[in-house]
Amino acid sequence: MRDQGRLDHFLVFCHRTSILNQWKSAAARLGLRLEEWPCPPEQSQDADGLLVTYQGAGRQREALGERLKQWSLSACMAIADEAHHLGVDPDEPDATAWGQTFLELTGSVRLRLGLTGTPFRADNLAFCAARRMRVRLDDSGWVEQIRPDLCVEPRDLIAAGDVRPLEFRFQDGWVEHSREGHPDRDVSPLSAEQRESWRARNLRRAIRLADSSSIGQQVLLRAQQKLNQLRERQPQAAGLVIARDISHAEAISRVLMDDGNRVELIHSQSPQATERLNAFQSGEADWLVSIDMCAEGFDAPRLRVVAYLTTVVTRSRFVQGITRAVRMTPELAAREAIPREASYVFAPADPLLMEYARSWSVAEPYVLRPQEQEAEDEQPGVGAWRGPSLPLEAVEDGAGAVIRLKTPELPAFLQR
């Protein structure tokens, strides 16, 4: 459209400054010059477009609006990167500042393009420039969905060689729940537990680092073994551990360092966290241990192994975490055939995580759900006890079992 003379300028919104730099570099490879806003008028005068964070646009809405008046907006494209950050409640369209700012600044442009690989973060929130359509689901009645104009599924990218496939190794075992002073014990199978409150309790116990036979320790051990194998072919390969909280991340880091690994521990309270994340991308550390710093926008193609040891089990967070290990570079692509060599995910055999693993490479429609949903009542006494607990231990040899999944194509029996 630029070559055809239908577009003159581009206005790109991002949620992080680091992603602005990625857009600037990508545009330069296409012969386009994008300047970060705010900038002096003479610097942006001959630019092909502007880059701005959502927060920056909100703070300087008036000034940016005046600058845009110098453009012919009928020949301008506005791009919302990670558009799920612009979620607007249809019943309260003024409630979300970023979405409202985007609407006001781009109301007169020729095209608005929203890009996202992440489901919207809350029920009933829709990207403010997206199409909403009512769809009938068999006998379940009508639902409302966000309908994208173009959907590129991860499995399509895998087939094209643009990203790596993932293979999953889920550590199974029996989880024992005992109370101090009580001779009786409750034993629950990690991968087969159907009661939600017990499933959640099992996962909390499974990620603990008790002793060498614990499920969490086995996940770390097998992840290290796989990374060592991968480093024989790719010496710069690294691993990522996603922990539950800061103290948990520190404990994991100690285990990895005791095993002789070079570890970079980075979390939201770490000094110079962004700079250290950037340094890790081309650094020498074997492992990056983090909590929530390595989601969207973090790009480290040398990551080949992910150990998922957190109690966050939403599909969006799981997929965000594991897809840090699918990135490719032109240099890597030149050395590998298609499909690319797989990366690996290690995690406790939680039923929800295994369900997500079976479908991560397929895009799911985003459904706008009713605003109010009745929570299921828990059975009295189930999952409510928070007293002293014993270290997690393997019951018989259950902790030695590993459930293996490959994607995107799965055996029929795993798709039931």
For each feature predicted by the language model, list its residue ranges.
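Loop/turn-to-beta-strand initiation segments
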Residues: 8-9, 46-50, 74-77, 108-113, ...
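Long, largely alpha-helical accessory region at the distal end of helicase-like NTP-driven motors
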Residues: 209-211, 215, 226, 347-416
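SF2 helicase catalytic motif II
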Residues: 56, 68-114, 118-120
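Conserved helix-turn-beta segment of the N-terminal RecA-like "Helicase ATP-binding" lobe
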Residues: 18-41, 258
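Conserved Walker A/P-loop ATP-binding site and its immediately adjacent core
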Residues: 6-29, 244-247
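Conserved RecA-like P-loop NTPase helicase motor core
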Residues: 262-371
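Conserved helicase motor
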Residues: 17, 36-44, 53-59, 85, ...
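Interdomain helical connector at the RecA1-RecA2 junction of SF1/SF2 helicase-like NTPases
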Residues: 124-236
